Each structure stands twice: as structure tokens, then as C-alpha cells.
Curated annotation (Swiss-Prot):
The keyword Transit peptide does not apply. It is a multi-pass membrane protein. It comes from Danio rerio (Zebrafish). Gene3D superfamilies: SLC41 divalent cation transporters, integral membrane domain (1.10.357.20). Disruption phenotype: Morpholino knockdown of the protein results in ventral body curvature, hydrocephalus, and cystic kidneys. One of its GO terms (cellular component) is plasma membrane. This is Solute carrier family 41 member 1. Keywords: Cell membrane, Ion transport, Magnesium, Membrane, Phosphoprotein, Repeat, Transmembrane, Transmembrane helix, Transport. GO terms for molecular function: magnesium:sodium antiporter activity. Residues 28-55, 92-121 are annotated as: Disordered. Na(+)/Mg(2+) ion exchanger that acts as a predominant Mg(2+) efflux system at the plasma membrane. Transporter activity is driven by the inwardly directed electrochemical gradient for Na(+) ions, thus directly depends on the extracellular Na(+) ion concentration set by Na(+)/K(+) pump.
Amino acid sequence: MVLWLKDQDKLSDMSTGTERIEMKKEGVPPAYHHSNGSVHPVILPDSPEEVPQTPGEYELTEVTSLPDCGDQENERPDMVVLDCRANAKGQREEDALLENASQSNESDDTSTDQSPVPPAPLKETSFSIGLQVLIPFLLAGFGTVAAGMVLDIVQHWTVFTEVTEVFILVPALLGLKGNLEMTLASRLSTAANIGQMDTAKDMWKMIMGNLALIQVQATVVGFLASIAAVIFGWIPEGNFRMGHAILLCASSVATAFIASLALGLIMIGVIIASRKVGINPDNVATPIAASLGDLITLSLLAGISTGLYKELEFNNYANPMVCAFFVALTPIWVLIARRIPSTREVLYSGWEPVIIAMAISSVGGLILDKTVSNPNFAGMAVFTPVINGVGGNLVAVQASRISTYLHMNALPIVEPNPAPRKCPTPWGTFFGSGVNSRSAKVLFLLVAPGHLVFLYTINSMRGGHTTLTYIFIAFYLAAALLQVIILLYLADWMVNWMWRRGMDPDNFSIPYLTALGDLLGTGFLALCFHILWLIGDRDTDVGD
């Protein structure tokens, strides 16, 4: 906190601190108090009656010039509280706005204070949140429907029937939109909202650093996902074929690399356009990331794996060369990502959530492999991307919004003496008075109508092998609602828990949440199909 006194000799009459400023003189109440370190210049009034007595936000006038000192001995010194706010790392920075518009900045070398002052948080109602989320949500949903139609078709292709481990790759690679693209969208949305992309130079630095970062992550995650698929495919029966293992590796790495590059470019365009038209990027970026993410990734996986499978008969070197080519590009992306401070930290510390999320999604892939491989449950393929995608999209929006809320309100990342905090209750998550509770209710209310629209679309396009009976729709909606309730509650707890421990939720929370969405969605859907089979709700066209 920076103080300026007209009479510096009277500084002993003042008591200063990081949390409050008050006069020691008797009868003068605190002039201004802000617990988050984000305050604006204010002159303490001469009369105590002019001081606001109730907490809240007040309209304050910035001081750009100061009056000359008088010769009167009894004149009370005027005190100017100069601008003090938290930077992107939660550390405080001080700006002294003096006469002639001179400015002095004190911050660490990671400060982003050179950009214009970030805009104030948007005041959002439930209606405005729903209006902004609805269209991207529907676009994302239709994208997952298209992905489901593709999976329903390609499940009968030779590569999927001969190398069934490819099914294990499906949730892991589709989950890349949560591990990488949605994390990228959340990270850039937060940066845009807090003013870190207001200048062209800062914007290009963020773009280049983040694109290089996701290419590194995509290559590594794609490689690890193929290893997980080989292990999960080998454990049940003990069969291992080197040719199939290299095929899985080449297909996974190539798909992850190309899909991440294409989706990353789309995300950057969406976020920049959202800011220009005055839309909160948190509401539109993550759903649009998923609207094309599943379709592009699944189409690439099917096409690349089919082409490489055909090469096994004629060329034993094609698959290893493809895998080696994309892996060899990794050092280049590492060098680019290291040059940008905002991505350097993620490059070193952001691997844990990505790798763990990939492992969680691979477990969901194992469930999908064992279920779809059974002809009695082949109808599950078309619905898996839909239920997983919708749940992941909604929880990614909520996590991104909570993270932006914490950043924009300058809440301390690490409290010096954190008080024990109980886990949030489901009632508080959905029926609290804050904007995050309102958004949770809006997102939950979109689940049932959205899934009904998507189910009708699949049925109209004659997709899948399952007749939409009333009992099937009831079980399907129950699974979808339960999945989203769990995910939204976990988002409320996880984002705040990570924030209090100094972890940036933009980088850590969304991979876990979308991976859990894949696991819960696939598990609940498989359970529904098994229950329906047991109670006799079976189709004569299953597997046709």
C-alpha cells in the first residue's frame, strides 16, 4: 500500500497496513478498507461524517493532481491512497499516480501490469448466463452427436474389430479437449478477462506460447495414451502384438497432434472474437472447443488408424516413422513454450493433471471396449460421446467461470493462516446467493432439454442400434442428470480447494473434471444398458 501525505512530518500520526488504513486521531473512523488488496485512489475527507460507514463498493475519483500545502498549522493533512492491486500471480503491485501523469510501478518480474487496467467483472443474471451459454451448448451437443454417429459407423471397421484396443484410445483422445483445448480456452479466457491480452504484443505472446505448450502436451499425452491402451488390452487376455502396439502409438500421437493444433487455432479465434463483441469468453469458448473437438478427433483417429493398419501388410516402417516424426518435433515446441513466462510454469508443473486425467479416461475406454465389443450392447457406441461430451462441456464452463471469478476479485491465492473450511454442501453449490450458484443452476437445467434434443436428432438420423423407448429415455436422462450433479458439485469444491493451495484452477481443475465426466458417463451408460437388458427392454436390431 502506498501513502502520500501533504505534510510528511505528520506520518507518525498514521497507522498503515496491507488490509486497512485508519487515522490514529480519536473519533476518525477508517476511511477505506478492502480485504483483497484491490483499491483505488481516494482522499480521506476532512469530516468523519463523509466517510462511508457500511461495507461495499463506492464510486471513487482518481487523483491526478494535488493541491499546494497551506501555512495553517491546524489544517488536517490530506492523505491519498494510491492504487494497489493484485497481479496475475496474486502478488500486490503499487501504482503512484502523480502530477503530470507520471507513473511508478513496483512489481515482480512476472507482473502483467504494463497492460491496461483490466475491465470490471460483468454483472450477470441467470437469464444472461443462460442466453450466452445456450447456443454454444447446443453447438457442442450437435458436435458430440456427430461424433457419436461417426463412432457408431466406424465401430464395425476392420481396424476397430481386429485391434479392439483402439476403443480404449477413444475416451482418452476425446478427453484431450478437456486436458488441453478446454484448459487452453479457460486459460486464455481468464487472461482476456483480466486484461493480459489487451495489447497486440501481449496477445501474440500468449497465443504462441500456448499453442506450443499444447503441442508438447498433446504429443506426450498421445504417446502415454497408446501405452495405457496396450497395457489395458494386454491385461485381460495376455495377448501382445508388437505391430498393433506401434499402430496404436502412431495413430494416437498423430491424432493428438493434428487435432490439438486445429482446435487450438479455433479456440484463439473464438476468444478474441468474444472479447470484441462483448461476450464473456468463459461462456462460449469451452463449449465451442467441444463442438468440433469430438468430431475432429474421432474422425482423425478412425482415418489415421485405418490407413496405418493397411500399411501393416506392405510396409513395416511406416508406423514407426510416423511416431518418430511427431515425437522429434517435441523439442522445438518446448523451446518456444519456455520463452513465454505464462506457459513456462505450466510446461514444468502442468503434467500431473494431464497425465492423471488421461489415465482416468483410459479406464472409461476400457469400459467402452468391453461393452461395445459385446454385440448385445453395440447400441451404446452412439450415445457415449454425447453423454460424455455434454457433461464435460458443462463442468468445464463452470470451472472456467469460478476460476475467472477468483482471479478478477483478486482473492488471495495462498492465505497465510488459512482457516479450516468445510466441503461445500450440494445446497450451497446450487442454491447459494452468488453468481457461481446461479450459473450452476442454469447449467444443470440445460441437461434434460439438451439431451432430449440430441436423442431426437440421433433417432431422426436413424443412428445407433437402440430404439428410443420411454424406459430407455428415463434411464438415460437419470444417468445424465446424476453425472452432471456430481461434476458441478466437484467443480465447486475442487476449484476453490486448488486456489487456496496456490494451484491455478485453469491448468489443474478442468482435466480432472472432464476425465471424471468421461468415466462417470461411460460407467453410468454401461450400467443403464445392462439394467435394460436384464429387465427385458431389448431391441431386435441390436448390432445390425
